Amino acid sequence: MAGTGRNIVRLRQNAGLSVKDLQDIFGFATPNAIYKWQKGMAMPTVDNLIILAAIFGVTVDNIIAVNICSTVGISA
């Protein structure tokens, strides 16, 4: 999840958006969810990933970071 969080931070900054901007776009009462996404403490829902991708002008797979080795159980 940490890699996904780093991607969200990078893409948000590249888009010139603040956390407050995303909070307003999503209509969240607080920015807590966005901070949790960025810190890798939580993942956005599929719906929110699609919205993030549209905001950033990328595809969902540009946001999600997956460690293939750990996903399929391969030791490095």
Regions found by a protein language model. Give the residues of each.
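Short alpha-helical DNA-recognition segment
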Residues: 16-36
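DNA major-groove recognition helix of helix-turn-helix/homeodomain DNA-binding modules
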Residues: 47-62
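A short, Lys/Arg-rich alpha-helix, primarily the initiator
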Residues: 1-15, 25
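A short, glycine-centered helix-capping/turn motif at helix boundaries
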Residues: 15-17, 57-58
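Residues within the helices of the helix-turn-helix
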Residues: 9, 20, 50
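Short, charged recognition helix plus adjacent turn
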Residues: 54, 64-76
